[in-house]
């Protein structure tokens, strides 16, 4: 790669384990070079981490990074990395904590391609995941090492379930290693990247860190400076780790998200229990073969204390599920136990297991694995919403909600022990996660129930929410250390709940945060929270924010995103108006994703408005974008590809727009391929988990 222009530079050195000094230089426009320090420091950190974690030293004397401000491009060119400005520039005044995380993840990903992508690359397009899935796994490991591993894992799985699980369940389902493709751009999918990363992670779980490292070292030794296949990666991991991965390789060839059913039959008199597991691979033609599924598991007693999990062969940490049906006999159980399954999300599967609301609340309070603790809470929240949405329910259904409300109070009381994890444990799953549990889901009814449950929980814990909100205030200059960032995150979660109570004081506080809050994280979070409510404070906050930051394009993306995610009625029309305004440019990829990506991908309530306005708007946008940047259309259509999963009226309205797009002359091959898939593919049910 080559780049030329009137760039300013900022440089530093990294000294590797052999004592060699490597010059790192970031190039950007003069007006933005001051915002590149975090990027430069990230490059130093990822270089050091890759050498320590995987033994991969940088192989040149210098590394150049170009901040691209005019094109939507991030590339891992050897020695000259290109990064979009949206994923490269950050400063304490105008960037949120999430912006810093994004810079770290994207910059880390592109650097890590030096070994998994450049020195060892993929042989052909069908092997894309050997490069992208492996590197995505590595960038996740890097990000986890730089922050809270539990929170990073929760964030990763939340995104996986929202995007990739939906892809697996809809018209766009395809294997990680596809057998064919119509347009190359359609290969750059959540399945290839994110499910591909989860497959590598499963190998890591099965082998353990030391054997996995030996296998990856062997992979580099065998294939350095060579194009490779997925099979060659698996063979190196198997040979280096001393495992047979023949069955494991099926993960790359079978589409869909597997479902694992777990049942515990306990015999108190004999102090034993039968752990029964079955797996179901949702392949349309029933040709799916049993997969190798590593499930991290554990047991908790009735008071929340860990109980050793073992059989006649010894302690069990990971259950290696290889058969369609498998039974394990557990021994030495002196009390009734609750099963904690898929800790750390060790396998990308849906787990179905019978657990009461009280069991889930106990796990939410006492589980030692951060991810499993969060997952139990998400299940309890989903149950509460589903119970409230039942047509014969009068008011809020008490049973799951009572357990949730009490656990919520305990979480707030104990939140100071780990602000970052507490913020995740208290956060509700979005409406789409609830809708995925129901055939022919009525999103409008579920949205009403979702709001009712959140409002009930907030009102029942009003004083504790205010106490936690005020305790997380940090005086003095803005700090980027993990503790300060965690306090800001928890404070924002509390404010979001406080606004649900329709309290004038909460609205006034949120407006004050927008007007004079310390840092962009605080201001942006308050703006996003206010935008869900049709009130004077919302209008004032939007006006103040726009006037203050109108000259800062990256900050104004936050302003656009806040409105795109708004829950109150008429969202499609408001977003359409913004998209037609002079300030918006569809060809500007970061701006388009902030407004349109947020609305079409994330706003389940506004997009699925009963009048079909969201669907018509999406079809218009896809046809317009297809003429400008056809490779980008697929990123806006995940919800449209799930059109069969909603109630009859919404499904019909979505199908009408799909047929309109498909019947339009001159559309690109990529868009035509996706519309053909949408109309031809059957429905694959993929509930997120039932307990």
Where are these regions (language model features)?
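Zinc-dependent metallopeptidase catalytic helix centered on the HExxH motif
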Residues: 55, 91-154
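Amphipathic alpha-helical substructures
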Residues: 181-274, 386-410, 632, 646-655, ...
């Amino acid at each position: 790669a080559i780049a030329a222009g009137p760039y300013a530079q900022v440089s530093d050195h990294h000294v590797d384990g052999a004592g060699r000094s490597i010059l790192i230089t970031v190039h950007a426009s003069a007006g933005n070079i001051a915002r590149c320090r975090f990027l430069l420091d990230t490059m130093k950190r990822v270089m050091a981490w890759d050498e320590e974690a995987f033994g991969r030293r940088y192989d040149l004397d210098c590394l150049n990074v170009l901040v691209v401000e005019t094109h939507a491009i991030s590339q891992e060119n050897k020695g000259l990395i290109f990064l979009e400005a949206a994923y490269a520039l950050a400063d304490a005044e105008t960037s949120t904590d999430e912006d810093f995380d994004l810079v770290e993840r994207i910059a880390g990903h592109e650097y890590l391609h030096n070994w998994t992508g450049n020195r060892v690359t993929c042989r052909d397009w069908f092997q894309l995941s050997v490069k992208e899935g492996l590197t995505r796994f590595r960038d996740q490991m890097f990000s986890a090492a730089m922050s809270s591993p539990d929170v990073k894992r929760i964030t990763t799985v939340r995104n996986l379930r929202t995007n990739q699980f939906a892809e697996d369940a809809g018209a766009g389902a395809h294997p990680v290693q596809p057998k064919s493709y119509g347009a190359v751009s359609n290969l750059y999918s959540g399945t290839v990247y994110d499910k591909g990363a989860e497959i590598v992670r499963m190998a890591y779980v099965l082998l353990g860190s030391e054997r996995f490292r030996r296998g990856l070292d062997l992979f580099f030794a065998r294939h350095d400076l060579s194009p490779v296949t997925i099979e060659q990666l698996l063979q190196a991991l198997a040979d280096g780790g001393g495992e047979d991965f023949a069955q494991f390789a099926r993960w790359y060839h079978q589409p869909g998200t597997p479902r694992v059913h777990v049942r515990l039959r306990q015999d108190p008199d004999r102090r034993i229990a039968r752990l029964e597991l079955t797996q179901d691979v949702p392949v349309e033609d029933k040709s799916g073969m049993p997969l190798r599924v590593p499930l991290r598991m554990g047991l908790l007693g009735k008071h929340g204390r860990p109980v050793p999990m073992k059989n006649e062969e010894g302690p069990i940490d990971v259950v290696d599920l290889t058969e369609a049906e498998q039974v394990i006999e557990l021994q030495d159980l002196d009390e009734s136990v609750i099963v904690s399954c898929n800790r750390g999300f060790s396998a990308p599967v849906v787990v179905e297991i019978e657990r009461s609301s009280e069991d889930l609340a106990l796990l939410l309070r006492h589980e030692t694995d951060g991810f499993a603790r969060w997952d139990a809470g998400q299940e309890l929240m989903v149950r509460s919403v589903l119970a409230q949405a039942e047509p014969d329910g009068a008011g809020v259904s008490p049973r799951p909600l009572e357990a949730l409300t009490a656990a919520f109070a305990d979480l707030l009381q104990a939140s100071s022990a780990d602000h970052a994890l507490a913020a995740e444990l208290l956060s509700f799953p979005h409406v789409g996660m609830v809708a995925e549990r129901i055939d022919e889901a009525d999103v409008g009814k579920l949205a009403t129930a979702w709001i009712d449950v959140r409002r009930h929980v907030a009102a029942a814990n009003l004083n504790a929410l205010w106490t936690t909100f005020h305790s997380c205030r940090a005086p003095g200059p803005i700090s980027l250390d993990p503790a300060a960032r965690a306090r800001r995150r928890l404070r924002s979660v509390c404010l979001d709940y406080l606004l649900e109570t329709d309290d004038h004081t909460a609205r006034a506080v949120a407006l004050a945060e927008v007007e004079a809050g310390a840092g962009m994280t605080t201001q942006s979070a308050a703006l996003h929270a206010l935008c869900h409510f049709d009130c004077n404070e919302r209008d004032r906050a939007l006006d103040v924010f726009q006037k203050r930051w109108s000259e800062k394009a990256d900050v104004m993306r936050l302003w656009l995103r806040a409105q795109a995610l708004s829950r109150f009625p008429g969202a499609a029309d408001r977003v359409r108006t913004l998209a037609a305004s002079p300030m918006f440019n569809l060809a500007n990829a970061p701006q388009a994703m902030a407004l349109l990506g947020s609305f079409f991908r994330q706003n389940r309530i506004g997009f699925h408005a009963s009048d079909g306005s969201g669907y018509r708007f999406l079809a218009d946008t896809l046809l317009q974008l297809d003429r400008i940047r056809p490779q980008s259309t697929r990123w806006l259509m995940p919800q449209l590809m799930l059109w069969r999963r909603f109630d009859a009226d919404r499904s019909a309205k979505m199908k009408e727009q799909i047929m309109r797009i498909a019947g339009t002359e001159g559309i690109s091959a990529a868009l035509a391929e996706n519309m053909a898939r949408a109309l031809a593919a059957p429905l694959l049910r993929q509930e997120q988990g039932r307990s």
